[in-house]
Curated annotation (Swiss-Prot):
The encoding gene: yidC
Family named by the database record: Belongs to the OXA1/ALB3/YidC family. Type 1 subfamily.
Species for this entry: Vesicomyosocius okutanii subsp. Calyptogena okutanii (strain HA)
Protein name (database record): Membrane protein insertase YidC
Record keywords, A-Z: Cell inner membrane, Cell membrane, Chaperone, Membrane, Protein transport, Transmembrane, Transmembrane helix, Transport
Transmembrane segments: 6-26, 356-376, 430-450, 463-483, 498-518
Top-level taxon of origin: Bacteria
Record HAMAP family: YidC_type1 (MF_01810)
Gene Ontology MF term list: membrane insertase activity
Pfam family, one: YidC_periplas
Length: 541
């Protein structure tokens, strides 16, 4: 097999991969826009009718309920809220249901050097995304539509933890204290209920938590990322739930597990008690999408006070240091694609390097060097084969001139020459073949790592974004051109023209790649050129 032909095949493979990526972006945007349009048209009359009844959205323990769940925009401004500020989160919790209606991440500005923080939960018209919770049965217990009271409208964490209580009282004297628990350096928000049964009857109570959101406006991202639902069950199975499939998922019950709404870099997860059996469901209510977790029923005797632990919420980034120990399988929200088994160790190695040198740019360079060292022997064999092919080029050309009209004899003489000179033209294939999964894995690592978001390096201000000055893609293209010149030219003129065009084509592709990935590819090319030049010089001498 001719090495140039193999390079051409690999180039075509990577081109198809990149084109597929681009198609995925367009397809996802079109699909989500169609979903928004269809649900708005179909449900206009339903929305108008349902706004008169706020309680139709409360989850049912026994049957599926496809009714409307919308924030009460008519009265939202009349309902007070309490602001909670921790070291990592700033939340606005509405007194209606004790719903977390807004959440900002303190360590993540929306843009570089901006005072405005990234908002994950929101009650804006353009982005409805809230965490609702309550108690059942409806009518006897406070749901996320019930009005709570709070002693303060502002809480700030000064120590290692903070408890924010909300109080509800029934007409017959039942007292419910809904409490949010916060810990320092944690994006986990705990929810529990302290209930005092002042009646003469035993209370049978079920708690629930649900996430509600619309499909977010697309921001024309060049690189595709997943936005939608996800769940993890007791069989350690992680499953994505596309928005369009929310109504098609059966209601299921299993021990532990969790459900989440995921977007690029950030997510919100409902994590109930890992030792209890919970009921999980998803549904579409007009143009809103719900994930609901209903906990098992508990009893409270007359005159007794009992604390019901509802669920934990994770409201934060896909940062491994924060999610690894929160719940089993939560690290799978970092979408490394089908090559997870390769990408996860690469991510851990990159994080370990960063923990030592504290620069993501230099960490990528060192990781590239380590990958290059791992493939050194394979690459050396490949480069020696290519150098040998380069030396044989004049003799191969002469054979073609002599036996060009007899393909069978030309092939036989060519193989005899390879055997005589102890050169295997296929030996250059393996290193390239092995590195393709590594490249694709690193592509997903650098695309998904929130740690690279707004990470500076040299003149770059954000390694997760394309190079605004196109310097790295141009250097990468030049390095690819130089690398080609070190290889033997293909005998076929058409192949030669295609190979000459590839550096230009890949430079165009890489203009929109994350600059961290382009940095890896550029450094890899430079190291390859150096290694190949040294080997060529040794052989020539």
């Amino acid at each position: 097999m001719n090495n140039q032909k193999f390079f051409l095949i690999i180039a075509i493979f990577l081109s198809i991969f990149l084109l597929w990526d681009k198609w995925e972006i367009t397809h996802t945007i079109d699909k989500n826009n169609n979903l928004i349009s269809q649900t708005k048209i179909k449900n206009t009359s339903t929305i108008n009718n349902s706004l008169t009844n706020q309680n139709l959205d409360i989850p049912s323990v026994t049957n599926r309920n496809n009714k409307l769940d919308l924030p009460n925009t008519d009265t939202k401004n009349q309902i007070p809220f309490t602001t909670v500020k921790t070291d990592l989160l700033t939340l606005e919790i509405s007194h209606k249901g004790g719903t977390i209606q807004n959440a900002w991440l303190n360590d993540y500005p929306i843009e570089i050097d901006s005072e405005q923080k990234f908002q994950l939960l929101s009650d804006r018209t353009g982005k409805i995304f809230q965490a609702q919770s309550g108690l059942l049965p409806q009518g006897k217990m406070p749901t996320h539509h019930s009005i709570f009271s709070s002693k303060n409208i502002y809480y700030q964490m000064d120590g290692n933890n903070l408890v924010v209580p909300f109080t509800w009282k029934s007409e017959n004297g039942i007292i419910v204290n809904k409490r949010y628990h916060f810990n320092k350096n944690s994006y986990v928000v705990g929810i529990d209920y302290q209930i005092t049964n002042t009646t003469n009857n035993t209370l049978h109570i079920t708690s629930y938590t649900q996430l509600i959101r619309n499909i977010p406006d697309q921001d024309n991202m060049i690189m595709p990322t997943y936005t939608g639902g996800a769940r993890f069950n007791d069989q350690d199975v992680y499953e994505k739930i596309e928005f369009e499939d929310f109504d098609d998922q059966p209601k299921t019950s299993y021990k532990g597990g969790w459900m989440a709404m995921i977007e690029h870099y950030f997510f919100v997860a409902v994590i109930p008690n890992l030792n209890q059996i919970h009921t999980y469901s998803s549904k579409i209510i007009n143009d809103k999408y719900l994930l609901t977790v209903v906990n098992p029923e508990l009893s409270i005797a007359p005159g007794a006070t009992k604390t019901i632990i509802n669920s934990n919420l994770y409201i934060g980034p896909k940062e491994q240091s924060h999610i690894d120990n929160v719940a089993p399988g939560l690290d799978k929200t970092v979408d490394y694609g089908i090559l997870f088994i390769i990408a996860k160790p690469l991510s851990e190695l990159l994080n370990w390097i960063y923990s030592i040198i504290h620069s993501w740019g230099y960490s990528i360079i060192i990781l590239t060097l380590l990958i290059k060292l791992a493939f050194y022997k394979l690459s050396e064999k490949s480069y020696r084969s290519m150098a040998g092919m380069r030396q044989l080029a004049p003799r191969l050309k002469k054979l073609k001139e002599t036996y060009g009209d007899n393909k069978q004899k030309l092939g036989k003489k060519t193989m005899e020459l390879y055997k005589k000179e102890k050169i295997n033209p296929a030996s250059g294939c393996l290193p390239i073949l092995v590195q393709i999964p590594v490249f694709i894995s690193l592509y997903w690592v650098l695309l998904e790592m929130v740690e690279l978001r707004q990470a500076p390096f040299w003149y770059l201000t954000d390694l997760s974004a394309p190079d605004p000055y196109y310097i790295l893609p141009l250097i990468m293209g030049i390095s690819m051109f130089i690398q080609q010149k070190l290889n033997p030219p293909p005998p076929d003129p058409i192949q030669a023209k295609i190979m000459m065009a590839l550096p230009f084509v890949f430079t165009i592709f890489f203009l929109w790649f994350p600059s961290g990935l382009v940095l890896y590819w550029m450094i890899n090319n430079i190291l390859s050129i150096t290694q190949q030049w040294v080997i060529n010089k040794r052989i020539n001498n």
